[in-house]
Amino acid sequence: MIFTTPIMTLYKSFYLLIVFLLGISLNIYAQSIQQIETELKQHLTRIDHFAYLSLKTEASAFDSLLSENIILEEKLIQYIKKNPEMLSYEFSQLKNENFSVATSPDRKFRIFSWDQRTGGSMHFYDNVFAYQINKETFAYSPTLPEGNPGGYYSDIYQLKDEKETFYLGYQHRVLSNRDQFQCIQVFNIEKGTLNEQYKKILTKSGYTATLGFSFNFFSVVDKKERPIRLF
């Protein structure tokens, strides 16, 4: 979900009219996975372009930045629903485009994440969750609480208990140049849908679906690993 304030929600309602018209053309013209990758890269390039212009206080550039984020989100969702390859293709062209793809080992669950470039030192991220049930692919963008900047997922780990398979998503949030946050979020696929709140982590207060902590980035900046993983 892109928008975390009421004003931004109004932007999405307006631009979704445009995206709806775009969606009609997507239903008509099939594309290869390579063509889809090229198209997604073009939108990411435009996001960078309008983010740069918006820093120069060009109001119209910020509107265009919001629009590009919405279109990218909606295109991803539509392409995933139509093309099962979206859960396994490597998307090597997008690796250096502020775009992250985390995939479960069984390739039945994938999270696409990108920096919307709408913030300053605090980064706001969008995600699209994609999963497969009986060879049918599903996708949606999760809803975030108002004011939550979201984060990107670098990894998905797969575990199995005596009953079922479940997944651990490794999320990173950039709250400022110094302050960052990491968490593990537990997912499972049940009753034909993705459960974002699968409570498998035992804490002193009971079972929870997420476990995370804040830290000072400058205290670990010397680590060579990127992204830094502290769990």
Name each model feature, range by range:
Residues 125-133, 183-191:
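Beta-propeller blade signature
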Residues 31-109:
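Start-of-domain marker
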Residues 136-139, 193-198:
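Beta-strand initiation motifs
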Residues 117-120, 174-177:
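Short glycine/acidic-enriched loop and turn motifs that connect beta-strands
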Residues 1-42:
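Bacterial Sec-dependent N-terminal signal peptides
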Residues 83, 136-143, 148:
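Trp- and S/T/G-rich repeat-edge/linker motifs of beta-rich repeat architectures
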